[in-house]
Amino acid sequence: MFYYTYKITNKINNKIYIGVHSTENLDDGYMGSGKLLKRAQDKYGIENFSKEILEYFDDKESMLEAEKNIVTEEFLNRPDVYNLKLGGEGGWDHVNIPGMLNQKKDASLKGAKSFKSRFENDILLQEKYRKIGSNVFKRLWSTPEYREKFLNNSRFLNKHHTPETINKMKESHAKNNHQKGEKNSQFGMMWIHSLDEKVSKRIKKTDPIPEGWFKGRKMKF
């Protein structure tokens, strides 16, 4: 039996789904089972989705515990995910064993408790799963189109950081020279927009502005 966590990516809009799968056949063609994910696959076509196996595990409990540490409430609040429920809750839609769905669930928490204990006491393991959950977001954030969608998402509009949070952010940014010089995501870049295509994007300041495009960023068309 193979146990693994995986990531499904919509190649058209870069939205993702993180899930788990148990199977005896790694070539079973499994492409996720989330409700929103299935709707998107019907809409865009399964050929426009890619699958990446994140990590293999020795047992189901360790697999679910790993998913729990990736698909958190913070993860679910992101606008670029298809996940609807917290990770680690189990269920049987991820299992691919003939006749398994007709058998009683034989739940053993031994593996999960062992993994949880190891996770809570292993800083390197915590960092590993934190990176899995954040690396995709960082890659998406590097694209102007994603940032615009994220910032305009209704769940994040009219929300403000508390003074305490703002001070913590300032202290953190001061320590790592956040957004200074070449670390600034805008370094050497400029915004241009097209009224015909109704889109804004970044280009290098040294690049010529294409015909029909204008300098500056436009949020609404």
Swiss-Prot record:
General function of this protein: Probably involved in the movement of the endonuclease-encoding DNA.
Natural source organism: Enterobacteria phage T4 (Bacteriophage T4)
EC number(s) given by UniProt: 3.1.-.-
Cited InterPro entries: GIY-YIG_endonuc, GIY-YIG_endonuc_sf
Cofactor(s) annotated in UniProt: Mg(2+)
Domain GIY-YIG stretches: 1-84
Signal peptide residue numbers: none
Domain of life: Viruses
An example molecular function term from Gene Ontology annotations: DNA endonuclease activity
Pfam families listed in its UniProt record: GIY-YIG
Descriptive protein name: Putative endonuclease segB
CDD domains: GIY-YIG_SegABCDEFG
UniProtKB keywords: Endonuclease, Hydrolase, Magnesium, Nuclease
Broad class of enzyme this protein falls into: hydrolase
Family to which this protein belongs: To endonucleases of group I introns of fungi and phage.
